[in-house]
Amino acid sequence: TSIAEQAKKTAGRRDWDEASYFDELAVRHRDYVPIARRILKWAVERGLDIWWGKGIQDPSFIPVLDFAGIRQQLFGIYLSGVFEVQFQYYKHPPFNHMEYRRELANKLNLISGVSIPEERLTKRPSFSLALLQSEDGLSHVLSTYDWFVNQLKHHATKEGADG
């Protein structure tokens, strides 16, 4: 029965890695491969951990900041061609406060076609990677998340110094 229990737990799951993710993305959304590769490169260059999803239907990769005692997911890039903002998981200062979530949403809303409404600031809103096919859109989302990471690091360092 323990084997049956384990089989139930792992049913509908798969371990993904960079190679398998990008192979499948090329099948599903070939046009999004350069976008996802650039986002991954950006995350790796900043020393972020990469968490590869386990889903079968719509797996993702998620850059994660691990710094000064905080571990924070940034966003998800899904095989369905979606960029997901992960407000629901923003538990660390300053993004545990609505004013900073609002500022992040406002920055992302400057990308043509992106519209994150106020009521989604505690959820996981998403938009199509197609909106990042322009250099302006992709550069803007990456610079916005540079700001995000810098804010997290600044607050973590400040709290460490205050503690």
Model-found features: residue ranges?
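Polyanion-binding interface signature
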Residues: 3-130
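Well-ordered alpha/beta subsegment
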Residues: 104-162
